[in-house]
């Protein structure tokens, strides 16, 4: 066989089939060409080209359908965190058990649940890596959003710690650095600081207007998901009341709110609220609270620099007739909002000593004033403070009701008020329920006298109150008390000077003031008290005190009745005219124990 035409020298690396070459037959090729030309250009295939008019069809509907599917797919990816798949939920426990790399506990990430902001950011970054297509399910209703937030909070072991951490992350300052803690939810306070978690913007805006009727000052700043309130209410409210109000206005649960009163004496806290109100993102309504202005305004800081003046405090206690330490401390502390000296008193470290010194000085001034005044001046001064109208006839009718000659009683009462020797002690005796104590107590009350109790007779100081009064009373004198009076108080009833033992002081020389006694014993018939008969003026009350059908006393022994009695019988009692003693139409200058101010009136 002859060699075929073509390349026979194969290159290294080629397979053997490249050696073979096709063989051509000239005879067969010539026959095929002749046959081809004889048949011509006719073909057996019919209707290969369609020359009819085209129809539009539903291409537009198809385009709209494709765009709608694409839009739904985009929305689906945006809302994928709200969509749950039953299949994924069933597979999730198994998938969680499968782990390629070892798991490490994160110490910095304290909370798994979040408001949605950070999780959404992380999901947006991992969007390209997501390969699992979650089938679409029903979207959670909007009304169930708040319930889901509460459920997320309930999953936390410490809800308050979570809210405090989110607050500090949002505002850059700790919530407890701005507030002081109230352990009881029933303690009332005017000012409250509140932080609320995950509030809808519409409800937050509406609360600005709804809180105006409740608050004098509103401070609101929102940094999602937290918002911060400073509410200064018109009246004091407890934490329970504040939470009830905010839950109704903001449609949130109490677990989403932390409420505490602000720090009133912290300069840093006051500056936080003051500087924050200048932020355009902060809503502020009303005037600044006093505790903010005090620590931020220059004029208030200058006022606080004022030193405490004890004489001003003594003058206040004297003018308001406060002599007890507790009353002085309580009433003067309440003036701190308006009085600079009272504010300086609260800032002083020795408040107890100042109150004690003030009470001592007031008693000294009162005692000196009383010693200088006569009985007429004393009665006139005490009657000036009695308000209202009464009738002197109630006193007269009651004395006559007890079968007492009123002229004789008036004469003895005149000697009693003038502290006449051997006539300065008046005894009212009789059976029980005759009005003895009611009659004498009403007189002691209107003249601001002192009541002595024989129950303290074992103490050597039980008679000390007589040194600070113009009239005294010993109620319900028994045989034991009569024996004591007969043994130790004869000189006192004579009207002479006696030595009275005073607590924490040296014994003083005084004369006993007019002394009234009530008793169920008639000493005029007791032989063993014969030495007291000449020293005591006795009047019997034999009849029981009458009451009407409504159980009201028929004789009104009130301050107004005694005021009318003294004014009506002033001359008969031989009380001196106040014009003779210098009281001409209240023109006398009142007592002043403070130094006159440089800008004071002349």
Swiss-Prot record:
- Give the gene symbol: E1
This protein's GO CC annotations = host cell nucleus
Location of region: DNA-binding region: 142-305
| Predominant location category | host cell
Q: Where is this motif: Nuclear localization signal?
A: 79-81
The answer, when asked if Nucleotide-binding is one of the entry's keywords, is yes
GO biological process annotations for this chain's record?
Answer: DNA replication
Reactions performed catalytically: Couples ATP hydrolysis with the unwinding of duplex DNA by translocating in the 3'-5' direction; ATP + H2O = ADP + phosphate + H(+)
Motif Nuclear export signal at which residues?
A: 91-100
Name this protein carries in UniProt:
Replication protein E1
Q: Enumerate the UniProt keywords alphabetically.
A: ATP-binding, DNA replication, DNA-binding, Early protein, Helicase, Host nucleus, Hydrolase, Isomerase, Nucleotide-binding, Phosphoprotein
Nucleotide-binding among the record's keywords? yes
Q: Which residues form a coiled coil?
A: none
The entry describes its oligomerization and partners as: Can form hexamers. Interacts with E2 protein; this interaction increases E1 DNA binding specificity. Interacts with host DNA polymerase subunit POLA2. Interacts with host single stranded DNA-binding protein RPA1. Interacts with host TOP1; this interaction stimulates the enzymatic activity of TOP1.
Lineage of this protein's species?
A: Viruses, Monodnaviria, Shotokuvirae, Cossaviricota, Papovaviricetes
Q: Which GO terms describe its molecular function?
A: ATP binding; ATP hydrolysis activity; DNA binding; DNA helicase activity
Can you tell me which family this protein belongs to? Belongs to the papillomaviridae E1 protein family.
* Enzyme class name: isomerase
Residues that bind ATP, according to the entry? 430-437
- Give the subcellular location: Host nucleus
Q: What does this protein do?
A: ATP-dependent DNA 3'-5' helicase required for initiation of viral DNA replication. It forms a complex with the viral E2 protein. The E1-E2 complex binds to the replication origin which contains binding sites for both proteins. During the initial step, a dimer of E1 interacts with a dimer of protein E2 leading to a complex that binds the viral origin of replication with high specificity. Then, a second dimer of E1 displaces the E2 dimer in an ATP-dependent manner to form the E1 tetramer.
């Amino acid at each position: 066989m002859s060699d075929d035409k073509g390349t026979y020298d194969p290159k290294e690396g080629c397979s053997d089939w490249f050696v073979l070459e096709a063989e051509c037959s000239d005879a067969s090729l010539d026959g095929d060409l002749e046959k081809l030309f004889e048949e011509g250009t006719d073909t057996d295939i019919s209707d290969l080209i369609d020359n009819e008019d085209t129809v539009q069809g539903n291409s537009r509907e198809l385009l709209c359908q494709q765009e709608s599917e694409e839009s739904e797919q985009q929305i689906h990816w945006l809302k994928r965190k709200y969509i749950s798949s039953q299949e994924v939920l069933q597979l999730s426990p198994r998938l969680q058990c499968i782990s390629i790399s070892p798991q490490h506990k994160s110490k910095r990430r304290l909370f798994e649940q979040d408001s949605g902001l950070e999780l959404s950011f992380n999901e947006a970054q991992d969007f390209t890596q997501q390969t699992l297509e979650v089938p679409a399910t029903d979207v959670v209703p909007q009304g169930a959003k708040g319930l889901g937030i509460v459920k997320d909070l309930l999953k936390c072991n410490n809800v308050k710690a979570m809210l405090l951490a989110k607050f500090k992350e949002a505002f850059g300052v700790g919530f407890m650095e701005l507030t002081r803690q109230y352990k009881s939810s029933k303690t009332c306070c005017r000012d409250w600081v509140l932080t609320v978690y995950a509030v809808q913007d519409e409800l937050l805006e509406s609360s600005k207007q709804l809180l105006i009727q409740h608050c004098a000052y509103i401070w609101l700043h929102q940094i999602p998901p937290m918002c911060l309130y400073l509410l200064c209410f018109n009246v004091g409210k407890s934490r329970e009341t504040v939470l009830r109000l905010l839950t109704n206005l903001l449609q949130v649960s109490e677990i989403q709110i932390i409420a505490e009163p602000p720090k009133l004496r912290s300069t840093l806290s006051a500056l936080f609220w003051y500087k924050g109100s200048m932020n355009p993102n902060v809503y502020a309504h009303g005037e600044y609270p006093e505790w903010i202005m005090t620590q931020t305004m220059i004029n208030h800081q200058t006022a606080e620099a004022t030193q405490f003046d004890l004489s001003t405090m003594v003058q206040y206690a004297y003018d308001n007739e406060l002599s007890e330490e507790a009353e002085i401390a309580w009433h003067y502390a309440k003036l701190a909002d308006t009085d600079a000296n009272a504010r300086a008193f609260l800032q002083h470290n020795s408040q107890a000593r100042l109150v004690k010194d003030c009470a001592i000085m007031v008693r000294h001034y009162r005692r000196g004033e009383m010693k200088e005044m006569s009985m007429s001046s004393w009665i006139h001064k005490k009657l000036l403070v009695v308000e209202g109208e009464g009738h002197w006839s109630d006193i007269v009718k009651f004395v006559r009701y007890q079968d007492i000659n009123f002229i004789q009683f008036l004469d003895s009462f005149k000697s009693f008020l003038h502290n006449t020797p051997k006539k300065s002690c008046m005894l009212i005796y009789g059976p029980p329920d005759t009005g003895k104590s009611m009659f004498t107590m009403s007189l002691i009350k209107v003249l601001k006298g002192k009541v002595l109790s024989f129950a303290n007779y074992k103490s050597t100081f039980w008679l000390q109150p007589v040194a600070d009064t113009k009239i005294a009373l010993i109620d319900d004198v028994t045989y034991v008390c009569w024996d004591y009076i007969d043994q130790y108080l004869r000189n006192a009833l004579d009207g002479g000077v006696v030595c009275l033992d005073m607590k924490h002081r040296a014994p003083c020389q005084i004369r006993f003031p007019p002394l009234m006694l009530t008793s169920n014993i008639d000493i005029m018939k007791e032989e063993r008290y014969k030495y007291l008969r000449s020293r005591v003026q006795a009047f019997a009350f034999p009849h029981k005190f009458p009451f009407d059908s409504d159980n009201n006393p028929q004789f009104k022994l009130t301050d107004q009745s005694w005021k009318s009695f003294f004014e009506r019988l002033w001359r008969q009692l031989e009380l001196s005219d106040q014009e003779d003693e210098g009281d001409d139409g209240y023109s006398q200058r009142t007592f002043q124990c403070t130094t006159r101010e440089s800008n004071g009136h002349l």
